[in-house]
Amino acid sequence: MIGSGISGLTTATKISEHKSVEVTVLEQARHFGGRADVDVDGEHCPRFFMDDYTELFSILGTIEGQDGRSVRSALLNARRLSHTHTSGWVEISHLYRLLAREIPITERITLARQWRPSPLVADQQGRNANRFGSLRDYSPVGLLRMARNLVRSKTGYVLPGPTDVYLIDPWLRDLRRRGVSLEADRRVTNLAQHGSHVAVTTAMGTEVFDVVVVTAFVPDLVNLLDASKIDHIAVDSGNTHCVAYTIQLDPREKVLADASPAMYCRDGVNILVQPGHDRCVVLCTMATRTDPDHVLAKVRSYLELDRDLVSVRCRVNQRPGEAVFVGDYVRSDRLLRRPMRGLYFAGSAIHNSYPIDAAEGAVRSALAAVRAIRRDYDLEVAR
């Protein structure tokens, strides 16, 4: 596997179930997880698991988590609060506030009429690092998929705390127990046909594999195929970048008194409060500004914080691999203009049955790649 995001880890998990198969995961970064990683600047985003993540939940149910329970069992229901002009913060029963019965119909109509975001965040007044964070970046099909997903998903779950602690680290331990080789800081620079196999080149030399599954995010995928002189139709576009903050709170704050996690959403600022770890993770989607002065003032106001913040980390998410895909899916069987024996593709931007760029889509695309490999190579029955 090239890449250790959700799709790469899923592919490694399922392929490692087969006898006589050696599995290696190559990750270009110094740590694993892809966009589900946690680096020195904090979380990539508030990690939210929709209630229809059926395939991901199935896999997480097999992975032992921090406390001996499965990772799936450790997920917590997240309360969702939306701000209204008449009642202040209201806990709602639907992810999409315009469909939440707790908000009066008259106010929902007002909200719908008032929601006229500038098509370009750059057109808005104030300091904003949300590069391409605009509706113009969404393809019409992408917008339709997003709307459909908002309507049909009513609730969601979150991790008790940091993504690496509760998701990625347990998953890596599980893969190592399965005998999977995990190699970080191994950027792949070239792919080439080698007979019926695939030659993979990194800084450490060239290795030959029977099968290679590329799970890199679209910009990295395009760069790799171009560098390998492999003719393809993938396009490095349709990506949006959103700034995230990871904030450690004083444990005496009133917002932490309720032990259950909660998501506060207002004016394009989305705040996931994780009381079990005295912290919150903030994602600026359509916020008018993303600079610390503006965002931290919003967080203080929305959460009614009284004390100094313990620590603040800001992740601007400007690298190509940190984007969110909002373009049109690419079919894996049409990505290459000429088929290449032994080369497969997976990832949340690869065509799958989930409507938006999400962990569930990454899993479904990985499962499709695994099915194709099993068919093409007549793999032995799983253990």
Say what each PLM segment does:
Residues 7, 31, 219:
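Conserved Rossmann-like nucleotide-cofactor binding loop
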Residues 146-202:
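Helical element adjacent to the flavin cofactor pocket in flavoenzyme catalytic cores
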Residues 260, 266-383:
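Conserved flavin/dinucleotide-binding core of flavoenzymes
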Residues 50, 56-145, 150-153:
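Mobile amphipathic helical/loop "lid" adjacent to a hydrophobic cofactor/ligand pocket
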Residues 1-7:
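Beta1/beta-strand and adjacent pyrophosphate-binding region of the FAD-binding site
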Residues 18, 186-293, 302:
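Mid-domain catalytic core of redox enzymes
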Residues 16-39:
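Glycine-rich FAD pyrophosphate-binding loop
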Residues 10-21, 177-178:
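A short, Lys/Arg-enriched amphipathic alpha-helix followed by its capping loop at the start of a domain
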